Amino acid sequence: MSLSRSLDLTQEDYAVQDAILQYISSNFVSLKPPDVKFFKRHLENVTKVLIQMMRKEDNLFNLIFQKERVAGSFWDKLKIGHPIEFDKNFVLTLPPALYKNIKFTPASPSYVTVNVQNGLKIVKSSKCRTYRPDWFDDNGNILSDKLRFWMESVVNKALATLPPLPNKKYQLEIEGTCYEIGTRKSGPAVTVEVNIDSSGSTYLGITQFCIDLVPAFEFQTKDWPHHIRQCPADTQDKTWNLVPKPLKPEENTADGNIPARLQWRLSFHNQESYIIHNLNHFKAVLKLLKKLRDVKFDQYKMSSYALKTVFMLEKERQNNDFWRRPLSSTFLHMLTVLTEWYGKGKIPFYWDKQHNLLGKLSKDQIKQVYCTLQKINNRIYEGLQSKCESKCDHFIIASTLLDSEELLKIKKDIIVDRSGNKPLAKRQRCS
């Protein structure tokens, strides 16, 4: 059942809900421009200096580091709340001979092994300065864990040149601004935690942020793995990446008992950014559902990437006009679609349908989320379907997206013309 089609709402009904959702987006979801400007400036300052330090302290990094690539929800304009989490890929290059006759073999779903046996013979004989014997096994497979550990060591080695602080962090000063910096492990990334000393600044918001630095190898379209969905033909930037995302034992389902340390995660941020761009309400609705997730669930049970994948899969089923429908209509439809995926117990990875993004959850956890989503759907339906003005709850969708304090604010700030169920008006305040 599609909830948005089952509701018998007029254009005015949708206009009321659209106005409410637009208010929610502006006040409780969208990033504030001053915050974005503040954190982007400090992000670029810290990243630039950190790269310089890493180049200076590690000769191999200096030789193989190519560029930084943005990744993640902030750069796709899908971040909600505060811009305090950033993702950057540090693109590294292999010795040129290794790119010839490189072989990608399917492993666990969304993972491959990378074999460079043929090129390795040339590299060994040429005494290549960027060759690291410990990055390869005896069969010429590149070891993902070695790259991950190496990247962590380079970051920590660079930070160790800074003045130490009592809390196992370091002090970095850039153009008169002091930063307190530390690191922690996070999947394939080295997470750099930054605390800004904002004394003397007029900025009064949050002053902590973090950067997930992910080492990545970049490849061209000619190397695109054949066993997955192919690259969109009209994507301008067709380069793609492999990242050393670690596999948990229960996630390693590769045939032939391929060790986790040989497996590399496929990553297609460039292509995904293209797929979701310029689609009217696509991003607005996705961010509203992320807001619902933050209020009702936790990120472990409903990851941001799983939500994004649900939307990319739905884009395959809909034409572009679908995303031009009223904001509330699209929201209700996608809420139902999300519910249906949890009902199936599977959200397939967009590029490799064999990978279930809900696979890390137990059946009971999936059922729990599904039942909660069903209750939310039913509650919204019951709140909106009544044509009796006294019974219709105009704030029913808002009540599922907001916490109690936010809901109180929206009810104070805006009113509904109940005489004709007209769009909202700003509540007048006495001066």
Curated annotation (Swiss-Prot):
Stretches of the chain forming a coiled coil according to its record: none
GO biological process, one term: innate immune response
Residues that, per the record, bind Mn(2+): 316
Annotated ATP binding sites: 73, 85-87, 290, 304-308
Key words of the record: Antiviral defense, ATP-binding, GTP-binding, Immunity, Innate immunity, Magnesium, Manganese, Metal-binding, Nucleotide-binding, Nucleotidyltransferase, Receptor, RNA-binding, Transferase
EC number: 2.7.7.86
Signal peptide span: none
Chain sites annotated for binding GTP: 212
Cofactor(s) needed: Mg(2+); Mn(2+)
Residues engaged in binding Mg(2+): 85, 87, 212
Catalytic reactions of this protein: GTP + ATP = 2',3'-cGAMP + 2 diphosphate; GTP + ATP = pppGp(2'-5')A + diphosphate; pppGp(2'-5')A = 2',3'-cGAMP + diphosphate
Molecular function in Gene Ontology: 2',3'-cyclic GMP-AMP synthase activity; ATP binding; double-stranded DNA binding; GTP binding; metal ion binding; RNA binding
Family per record: Belongs to the mab-21 family.
Role: Nucleotidyltransferase that catalyzes the formation of cyclic GMP-AMP (2',3'-cGAMP) from ATP and GTP and plays a key role in innate immunity. Acts as a key sensor of double-stranded RNA (dsRNA), the presence of dsRNA in the cytoplasm being a danger signal that triggers the immune responses. Directly binds dsRNA, activating the nucleotidyltransferase activity, leading to synthesis of 2',3'-cGAMP, a second messenger that binds to and activates Sting, thereby triggering the immune response via activation of the NF-kappa-B transcription factor.
Protein name, as recorded: Cyclic GMP-AMP synthase-like receptor
Organism: Frankliniella occidentalis (Western flower thrips)
